[in-house]
Regions:
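Glycine-rich FAD pyrophosphate-binding loop
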Residues: 25-44
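N-terminal FAD cofactor-binding segment of flavoenzymes
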Residues: 42-81
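Predominantly flavin-linked oxidoreductase catalytic cores and closely associated redox partners
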Residues: 115-258
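Short phosphate-binding/catalytic loops that engage adenosine nucleotides
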Residues: 29, 61, 121
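Short beta-strand to alpha-helix junction loop
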Residues: 93-114, 238-243
Length: 262
């Protein structure tokens, strides 16, 4: 088994893992990032908050992201039964950024990892964490399995779990606990937004609360694609019948505001 040593092992190459890697690399740490998937890859989580921007700037990732031309996000809109609430990020009580981005994550995450690699950060894709052990002094030994089946061991002083929904360390260390929240699921897609209005209406991220326990998200991107999703009780989504298109028509039927557009 091939073995190596680093200061910090980071699990997951998404935004949190990338920012952590960039910062630690700046501080002179020997960093290794392992990512289960290959990039680019589709994933949701496509709307940022302005608080993120200073972190991208601090670790030297902001310019590459800004140069890509992602859709700017200056606020958000929430709707329910004709009542509309706008949040304007410029109306704030503290210093800091008043805008951010709406991003297709396949592009966004690829820009982050490409920039990291240009800076000299070691990133390995299609590498799955299968086991981890911690010594009494807190140092770790983590086994990584590649798509070729080859297993390697990485020793690290620290491990950062940036795997998000993958929950790598909680699963491997038996730390998972059931959620007390109601069980929800989502159905989502990317669509060519042929009927997108001009101006702010066409680019404004919106959450249309169509029932007390369900909502539709609309996240326009700068490339003419819009992320469209429905979140609701799992039981309700599983009760829908017909083709994917037919189920989408049923879900969009809850929104008087967006049905005709999509």
């Amino acid at each position: 088994m091939r073995k190596s040593e680093v200061d910090v092992l980071i699990i997951g190459a998404g935004p949190s893992g990338s920012v952590a890697a960039a910062y630690l690399h700046q501080q002179g740490c020997k960093v290794k990032v392992v990512e289960k998937n290959s990039f680019p890859r589709f994933v949701i989580g496509e709307s940022l908050l302005p608080r993120c921007m200073e972190h991208f700037e601090e670790v030297g990732l902001l310019k590459a992201l800004n140069d890509f031309g992602f859709e700017e996000k200056h606020g958000a809109r929430f709707m329910k039964e004709g009542v509309v609430c706008h949040f304007d990020f410029s109306k704030k009580h503290t210093d800091g950024w008043n805008w951010t981005w709406q991003v297709p994550r396949a592009d966004f995450d690829k820009v982050l990892t490409d920039t990291l690699q240009e800076k000299g950060v070691d990133i390995s894709f299609q590498q799955e964490v299968i086991a981890v052990e911690f010594d009494e002094d807190g140092c770790s030994r983590t086994q990584i399995k590649g798509v070729d089946g080859v297993i390697q061991e990485i020793s690290a002083k620290f491990v950062i779990d940036s795997s998000g929904f993958g929950r790598v360390l909680p699963r491997l260390l038996g730390l998972e606990k059931p959620s007390s929240l109601a069980v929800h699921s989502s159905m989502f897609t990317h669509v060519v937004d042929k009927n997108r209005p001009q101006g702010n209406e066409g680019t404004l991220i919106t959450f249309d609360v169509v029932r007390d326990d369900s909502w539709i998200w609309v996240i326009p991107f700068s490339n003419g694609i819009t992320s469209l999703g429905f979140v609701g009780p799992t039981e309700y989504l599983e009760s829908l019948e017909g083709s994917v298109e037919a189920r989408w028509q049923q879900l969009l039927g809850h929104s008087d505001y967006y049905y005709d557009r999509f």
